[in-house]
């Protein structure tokens, strides 16, 4: 599956979850899925809990986050030592 095909699984609609990106056909936000992964859930566990999801949906969330970060500019923070 191409990146473009994966990203088609993510939609944004101001009327759904206040416009946050969601997996198409669900009310599951990309943010929520990434939070589950960040806290140790495996894709298989997420799919077991939300049986309408697929591996491709999980991959789409990760890819969406990656693409969102690609064009951002980050500024290093100055850290003072004591």
Please provide the spans of the model-predicted regions.
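Long, charge-rich, low-complexity alpha-helical segments
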Residues: 29-82
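N-terminal first-folded block
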Residues: 1-27
